[in-house]
């Protein structure tokens, strides 16, 4: 009876250790993808028409030449004629073809001006073939362009909001060619993690073998990939097995990372970030140098200054009347120094991110100051996380 209790206690302890090590669980479809099953990039060159005088300058040769070629294909000859239209813009059209998109399916596209058009507001994208990396046409884009901003102006002033030289064509791309995936003869495939991690990939293979072991055999390759092989005795449909596989809950682990954007002052930290015992004192030293221009004007009726090194003399009496005076421009320089008074804050070993933020907020630091502090803590060897600056 005593041995039984000890054995059960050991199982409970091991289970708790397993749970703490792996953290939370996520669906397999959210953390991994099948190798080779992916989107494909498409690109094309087109024209946007219907702009209210905000299109490309007529001096842009590629825009006028594109319009001329378009009209020629419509049976309108533009030889020896000058095009003067500012309601047209040359654009690049980009889109992503989903892995299993069928002929006739509709997807979105991004339209970006490549000329000097001020705005694509109110424009319509004319039929534009979209090609893949192999040069083949996979889709055709056409439709009204929608923007998230505007740009208007007159001869001497203008105003705008967000970015008006790029927009979207919602559901304006018609798929004309499919990408073939032969799953009927597939007996093995590879799962690639979206965030490579040795612990997660090992756990993924373990969960698949325990849950779907009668159908598949999973083997960890590295921190990025897990090979999956269909067993000979598997009589079920591969699509059904993949469907069950996608909904498996996999314990996910990740390394501690602190991401900082110096351009915007944004700092993002995961909950696993730990800091060793360190003392932090942060204060800003501001030095301001100001120069004012002043004019020194002599008193009224004072004698003029003499030339050379001789003092000024009264011509009638021969009396020395001082050096004389003249108008002089001088600089009045003022130097001011202001230093913030901050106390030293001691951060204990192994604190969580919540405690770190609370301690730094107590110092009154801003997000941009936090970037400098985290870099300094990392340099001191107290930050137990990877530091990424973007």
Swiss-Prot record:
Transmembrane parts of this sequence: none
GO MF terms here are: structural molecule activity
Where is the protein situated, by its record's location annotation?
Answer: Periplasm; Bacterial flagellum basal body
* Gene Ontology biological process terms, A to Z: bacterial-type flagellum-dependent cell motility
UniProt entry keywords in alphabetical sequence: Bacterial flagellum, Periplasm, Signal
Report any Pfam family annotated for this entry. FlgI
Give Gene Ontology CC terms: bacterial-type flagellum basal body, distal rod, P ring; outer membrane-bounded periplasmic space
- Give the source's domain of life in one word: Bacteria
InterPro entries associated with the record: Flag_FlgI
Extract the signal peptide range: 1-25
Q: What does this protein do?
A: Assembles around the rod to form the L-ring and probably protects the motor/basal body from shearing forces during rotation.
* Protein family according to the UniProt entry: Belongs to the FlgI family.
Q: How does it assemble?
A: The basal body constitutes a major portion of the flagellar organelle and consists of four rings (L,P,S, and M) mounted on a central rod.
This chain's protein is named: Flagellar P-ring protein
Report which gene this protein is encoded by.
flgI
């Amino acid at each position: 009876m005593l041995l039984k209790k000890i054995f059960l206690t050991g199982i409970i302890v091991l289970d708790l250790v397993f749970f703490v090590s792996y953290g939370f669980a996520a669906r397999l479809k959210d953390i991994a993808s099948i190798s080779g099953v992916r989107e494909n990039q498409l690109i094309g060159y087109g024209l946007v028409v219907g702009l209210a005088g905000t299109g490309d300058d007529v001096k842009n040769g590629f825009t006028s030449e594109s319009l001329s070629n378009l009209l020629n294909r419509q049976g309108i000859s533009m030889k020896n004629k000058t095009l003067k239209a500012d309601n047209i813009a040359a654009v690049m059209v980009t889109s992503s073809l989903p892995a299993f998109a069928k002929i006739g399916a509709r997807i979105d596209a991004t339209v970006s001006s490549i000329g000097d058009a001020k705005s694509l507001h109110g424009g319509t994208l004319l039929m534009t073939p979209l090609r893949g990396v192999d040069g083949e046409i996979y889709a055709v884009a056409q439709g009204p362009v929608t923007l998230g901003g505007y740009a208007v102006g007159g001869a001497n002033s203008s105003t705008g909001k967000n970015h008006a030289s790029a927009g979207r064509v919602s559901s304006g791309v018609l798929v004309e060619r499919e990408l073939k995936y032969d799953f009927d003869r597939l007996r093995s495939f590879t799962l690639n993690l979206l965030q490579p991690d040795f612990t997660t990939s090992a756990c993924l293979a373990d969960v698949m073998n325990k849950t779907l072991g009668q159908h598949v055999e999973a083997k960890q390759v590295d921190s990025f990939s897990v090979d999956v092989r269909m067993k000979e005795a598997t009589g079920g449909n591969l699509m059904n097995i993949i469907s069950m596989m996608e909904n498996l809950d996999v314990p996910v682990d990740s390394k501690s990372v602190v991401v900082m954007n110096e351009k915007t002052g944004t700092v993002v930290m995961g909950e696993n970030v730990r800091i060793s015992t360190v003392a932090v004192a942060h204060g800003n030293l501001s030095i301001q140098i100001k120069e004012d221009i002043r004019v020194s004007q002599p008193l009224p009726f004072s004698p003029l200054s003499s030339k050379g090194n001789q003092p000024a003399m009264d011509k009638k009496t021969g009396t020395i009347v001082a050096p004389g005076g003249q108008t002089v421009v001088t600089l009045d320089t003022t130097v001011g120094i202001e230093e913030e008074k901050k106390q030293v804050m001691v951060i204990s070993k192994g604190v969580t991110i919540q405690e770190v933020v609370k301690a730094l907020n107590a110092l009154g630091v801003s997000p941009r100051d936090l970037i400098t502090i985290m870099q300094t803590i990392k340099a001191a060897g107290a930050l137990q996380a990877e530091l990424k600056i973007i």
